[in-house]
Protein backbone atom coordinates (compact mmCIF):
# COMPACT_ATOMS: atom_id res chain seq x y z
CA UNK A 1 0.00 0.00 0.00
CA UNK A 2 1.57 3.35 -1.03
CA UNK A 3 2.36 5.93 1.64
CA UNK A 4 -0.18 8.71 2.06
CA UNK A 5 1.02 11.91 0.41
CA UNK A 6 1.66 14.72 2.87
CA UNK A 7 -0.62 17.72 2.92
CA UNK A 8 0.76 21.06 1.77
CA UNK A 9 1.13 22.18 5.38
CA UNK A 10 2.90 18.97 6.42
CA UNK A 11 5.30 19.27 3.49
CA UNK A 12 6.00 22.93 4.23
CA UNK A 13 6.66 22.18 7.91
CA UNK A 14 8.98 19.30 7.00
CA UNK A 15 10.81 21.56 4.55
CA UNK A 16 11.24 24.25 7.21
CA UNK A 17 12.66 21.67 9.63
CA UNK A 18 15.16 20.50 7.01
CA UNK A 19 16.26 24.07 6.30
CA UNK A 20 16.75 24.77 10.01
CA UNK A 21 18.77 21.56 10.43
CA UNK A 22 20.99 22.38 7.45
CA UNK A 23 21.45 26.01 8.52
CA UNK A 24 22.85 24.87 11.88
CA UNK A 25 25.78 23.42 9.95
CA UNK A 26 26.38 20.50 12.31
CA UNK A 27 24.95 17.84 9.98
CA UNK A 28 27.36 15.24 8.54
CA UNK A 29 27.84 15.53 4.78
CA UNK A 30 25.97 12.34 3.84
CA UNK A 31 23.03 13.30 6.04
CA UNK A 32 23.07 16.84 4.65
CA UNK A 33 22.95 15.54 1.08
CA UNK A 34 20.03 13.25 1.89
CA UNK A 35 18.21 16.08 3.69
CA UNK A 36 18.84 18.42 0.76
CA UNK A 37 17.45 15.86 -1.67
CA UNK A 38 14.37 15.37 0.51
CA UNK A 39 13.98 19.15 0.76
CA UNK A 40 14.08 19.53 -3.01
CA UNK A 41 11.36 16.88 -3.39
CA UNK A 42 9.21 18.60 -0.75
CA UNK A 43 9.77 21.95 -2.43
CA UNK A 44 8.60 20.56 -5.76
CA UNK A 45 5.54 18.99 -4.12
CA UNK A 46 4.64 22.33 -2.50
CA UNK A 47 5.14 24.19 -5.79
CA UNK A 48 2.97 21.67 -7.65
CA UNK A 49 0.24 21.99 -5.02
CA UNK A 50 0.30 25.78 -5.26
CA UNK A 51 0.14 25.67 -9.06
CA UNK A 52 -2.81 23.28 -8.92
CA UNK A 53 -4.60 25.56 -6.46
CA UNK A 54 -3.97 28.56 -8.69
CA UNK A 55 -5.40 26.73 -11.71
CA UNK A 56 -8.46 25.71 -9.70
CA UNK A 57 -9.04 29.29 -8.54
CA UNK A 58 -8.54 30.63 -12.05
CA UNK A 59 -11.07 28.15 -13.41
CA UNK A 60 -13.59 29.01 -10.71
CA UNK A 61 -13.20 32.74 -11.29
CA UNK A 62 -13.40 32.32 -15.07
CA UNK A 63 -16.60 30.31 -14.76
CA UNK A 64 -18.07 33.17 -12.73
CA UNK A 65 -16.87 35.75 -15.28
CA UNK A 66 -14.74 37.45 -12.66
CA UNK A 67 -11.33 38.85 -13.41
CA UNK A 68 -8.41 37.27 -11.58
CA UNK A 69 -4.79 38.29 -11.85
CA UNK A 70 -1.95 36.38 -10.23
CA UNK A 71 1.39 38.11 -10.04
CA UNK A 72 4.36 36.11 -11.26
CA UNK A 73 6.88 35.29 -8.58
CA UNK A 74 10.42 36.47 -9.23
CA UNK A 75 11.64 33.12 -7.86
CA UNK A 76 9.93 31.09 -10.60
Curated annotation (Swiss-Prot):
Entry EC no(s): 3.1.11.6
Pfam families the record matches: Exonuc_VII_S
Keywords recorded for this protein, A-Z: Cytoplasm, Exonuclease, Hydrolase, Nuclease
GO biological process, one term: DNA catabolic process
Gene Ontology CC annotation, any one: exodeoxyribonuclease VII complex
Localization annotation: Cytoplasm
Keyword Thylakoid: no
Presence of keyword Nuclease: yes
Gene Ontology MF term list: exodeoxyribonuclease VII activity
Catalytic activity: Exonucleolytic cleavage in either 5'- to 3'- or 3'- to 5'-direction to yield nucleoside 5'-phosphates
Quaternary context: Heterooligomer composed of large and small subunits.
PANTHER family: EXODEOXYRIBONUCLEASE 7 SMALL SUBUNIT (PTHR34137:SF1)
Role noted for this protein: Bidirectionally degrades single-stranded DNA into large acid-insoluble oligonucleotides, which are then degraded further into small acid-soluble oligonucleotides.
Family: Belongs to the XseB family.
Protein known as: Exodeoxyribonuclease 7 small subunit
Organism: Enterococcus faecalis (strain ATCC 700802 / V583)
Phylogenetic classification of the source organism: Bacteria, Bacillati, Bacillota, Bacilli, Lactobacillales
Amino acid sequence: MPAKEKTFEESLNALEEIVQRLERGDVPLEEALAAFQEGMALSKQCQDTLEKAEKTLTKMMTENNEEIVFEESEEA
